[in-house]
Amino acid sequence: MLYLRGTEGSMKSTFEQKSTLPVSAAEVWRHVTTPEGINDELFPWLRMTIPARLRGKAIDQLPCGQYLGRSWFLALGVLPVDFDDITLAEVGPEYRFKEASSMLGIRTWVHERTVRDIGEGSEVHDRLSFELRRPGLWIPGWRHAMIGILKFLFRHRHTRLIRWAADRKKLNN
């Protein structure tokens, strides 16, 4: 399920995407908070580089509220198209993080992900709020193009997560 909020005159937009997975929240959390898990979600369209100081660390080992480094988005895994100046705003309670960062083309980027157990599986809930930088907004159709790209990307991420979880469930049975 995908929701979009924001008005034509507003520079900020918000998306929410939810998916139900057939594996536990703990198992999903272990996957989605690793560089490998993040890049698996983005594959094949994007790959994110990992700043050196973050390599080999679990999300709960990272400081909140501090700049953590620059991650590059590589289209098809090779072509740099944007960067993310990563700041982890919050971790927890339980299986939750909130990233508040900026990018080359996006002034503010707030990505909150919550994973919770439901029934015999789990639910992944992403909430993304962003504000594009003004120069891009002067290009006719740019805002709509960016919204379309981000909607596609988050749907794709959840499709990849659903596929990963189904494969994990098969392995566990």
Question: Predicted regions span which residues?
Answer:
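A short, structured loop/turn motif at beta-sheet edges
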Residues: 22-25, 88-94, 114-125
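Hydrophobic pocket/interface hotspot
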Residues: 28-32, 38, 88, 124-126, ...
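Hydrophobic ligand-binding cavity/cleft-lining segments
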Residues: 2-63
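Beta-strand/loop substructures that line and gate deep hydrophobic ligand-binding cavities in soluble
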Residues: 98-152
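Alpha-helical packing segments of well-folded alpha/beta enzyme cores
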Residues: 153, 157-161
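Glycine-rich portal/gate segments that line the openings of hydrophobic small-molecule binding cavities
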Residues: 50-104
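Short, highly charged C-terminal tails/helix-capping segments
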Residues: 49-56, 161-173
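Short, surface-exposed coil-to-beta transition loops
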Residues: 14-16, 80-85, 107-112
